[in-house]
Regions:
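Exposed, interaction-prone assembly regions rather than primary DNA-binding/catalytic cores
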Residues: 121-131
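Short cysteine-rich clusters marking metal-coordination/redox-active sites
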Residues: 9-12, 66-69, 94-97, 118-121
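Short linker/helix segments within small regulatory modules
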Residues: 25, 52-60, 82-88, 105-117, ...
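His-enriched metal-coordination microenvironments in redox/metal-binding proteins
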Residues: 1-6, 17, 133-135
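N-terminal cysteine/histidine-rich coordination modules
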Residues: 1, 13-47
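Acidic, low-complexity intrinsically disordered segments
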Residues: 47-82
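Short functional micro-motifs and their immediate structural scaffolds
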Residues: 14-17, 71-74, 99-104, 125-127
Length: 135
């Protein structure tokens, strides 16, 4: 089950809703691959062609943040493993400054998003609240 969060900066007016996790649609590796961009789907399919015993250890819908300009994106994270070796893992480039974005760990039990900063004012005084469960 996925979780929806509302984040709000305590220093400025920034707020945004974000989704984290997976729902019932993502019950197979194939369904997870379909949740990525068309370009990413092509890359993944080429990498896994003919492979067996594939394991998905992705986070599902995740929050990525740029460590340079603090832009946020909410995209599907996929990590595919075969025999304890990572074959593919989602990487996101910042749409503003082209820096590789960092995957921010979310603790659904504690309602925290580790290391999140406000993309507007760069403050780390960001409030995180659960606003829905989705499937």
């Amino acid at each position: 089950m996925g979780t929806g969060y509302e984040i709000g900066c305590n220093k400025c007016s920034f707020s945004r809703s974000l989704r984290v996790g997976v729902g019932m649609f993502h019950s197979s590796l194939e369904a997870e691959i379909e949740s990525t961009s068309k370009k990413e789907q092509q890359t993944i399919k080429q990498i896994i062609l003919g492979k067996q015993n594939l394991i998905s250890e992705g986070e599902g819908y995740s929050i990525f943040q740029c460590s340079t300009c603090y832009a946020l994106v909410n995209k599907f994270h996929i990590k595919i493993i075969e025999n304890n070796q990572t074959l593919y893992e989602s990487k996101n480039q910042c749409f503003k400054c082209n820096t590789e974005m960092q995957l921010l760990p979310c603790d659904k039990d504690e309602n925290t998003i580790e290391g999140i900063k406000c993309p507007k004012c760069k403050s780390d005084d960001v409030q995180v609240g659960k606003n829905m469960l989705w499937d």
